[in-house]
From Swiss-Prot:
Pfam family, one: Gar1
Keywords, comma-separated and alphabetical: Isopeptide bond, Nucleus, Repeat, Ribonucleoprotein, Ribosome biogenesis, RNA-binding, rRNA processing, Ubl conjugation
Gly residues biased stretches: 1-68, 179-231
Name of this chain's protein: H/ACA ribonucleoprotein complex subunit 1
Role according to the record: Required for ribosome biogenesis and telomere maintenance. Part of the H/ACA small nucleolar ribonucleoprotein (H/ACA snoRNP) complex, which catalyzes pseudouridylation of rRNA. This involves the isomerization of uridine such that the ribose is subsequently attached to C5, instead of the normal N1. Each rRNA can contain up to 100 pseudouridine ('psi') residues, which may serve to stabilize the conformation of rRNAs. May also be required for correct processing or intranuclear trafficking of TERC, the RNA component of the telomerase reverse transcriptase (TERT) holoenzyme.
UniProt-listed GO biological process terms: pseudouridine synthesis; rRNA processing; telomere maintenance via telomerase
Coiled-coil annotated spans: none
Source organism of the structure: Mus musculus (Mouse)
Family: Belongs to the GAR1 family.
GO CC annotations, alphabetized: box H/ACA snoRNP complex; box H/ACA telomerase RNP complex; Cajal body; chromosome, telomeric region; dense fibrillar component; fibrillar center; telomerase holoenzyme complex
InterPro entries associated with the record: Gar1/Naf1_Cbf5-bd_sf, H/ACA_rnp_Gar1/Naf1, Transl_B-barrel_sf
Region feature RGG-box 2, mapped onto this chain: 180-231
One annotated GO molecular function: snoRNA binding
Length: 231
């Protein structure tokens, strides 16, 4: 599951249909990186884990496309909302919030953000920080001002616009992933054609980490944690 750019079914930058990533490892990459486990969102270690920025049909990335998770159409407030986070400080015309979701669930990029009364204040713009202690920024709606919010004011989200953190963590030892070169199915081998799995790299994933383990978030806009399209 990677984001930014992408052909049909692709998960990360550039890439043909069904391809997973431009740089590294087996399955679910974030964007770029060295080898090894651990993980970070946008950058960092190799393969497994999951990824944000990407594009193409079926992907999570920034551009539109079918089957993606971002660029949500405004369909009015959801039936119910759950706690997403707390206001920390303004940043130019945006606001920065600490994520306080249950079980550290990760919001989709571009997912609408609400007050408790379901009034929309903006959309999730960036995610950054450590895997289990992260923040997000909100790009405010035109009628909202960053200076109008108080410290620790709570914000809410549609529960269907959250993903479990486990989606971005390395697999437990001994757990097998999909066959090499599989993933998107269809033609192609390593690095890119249809169904390709990407070259090099180990398992890992993560948010914006450095090489190998550890890791933090640093995601961009997009669906599903994810820089991308409509759900």
């Amino acid at each position: 599951m990677s984001f930014r750019g992408g052909g049909r079914g692709g998960f990360n930058r550039g890439g043909g249909g069904g391809g997973f990533n431009r740089g590294g490892g087996s399955n679910n990459h974030f964007r770029g990186g060295g080898g090894g486990g651990g993980g970070s969102f946008r950058g960092g270690g190799g393969g497994g884990g999951g990824s944000f920025r990407g594009g193409g049909r079926g992907g999570f990335g920034r551009g539109g496309g079918r089957g993606g998770f971002n660029k949500f159409q405004d369909q009015g407030p959801p039936e119910r909302v759950v706690l997403l986070g707390e206001f920390m400080h303004p940043c130019e015309d945006d606001i920065v919030c600490k994520c306080t979701t249950e079980e550290n669930k990760v919001p989709y990029f571009n997912a609408p953000v609400y007050l408790e009364n379901k009034e929309q204040v903006g959309k999730v713009d960036e995610i950054f920080g450590q895997l289990r202690d992260f923040y997000f920024s909100v790009k405010l709606s035109e009628n909202m001002k960053a200076s109008s919010f108080k410290k620790l004011q709570k914000f809410y989200i549609d529960p269907y616009k959250l993903l479990p953190l486990q989606r971005f963590l390395p697999r437990p030892p001994g757990e097998k992933g999909p066959p090499r070169g599989g993933g998107g199915g269809g033609r192609g081998g390593r690095g890119g054609g249809r169904g390709g799995g990407g070259r090099g790299g180990g398992r890992g994933g993560g948010f914006r980490g450095g090489r190998g383990g550890g890791g933090g978030f640093r995601g961009g806009r997009g669906g599903g944690g994810f820089r991308g399209r409509g759900h």
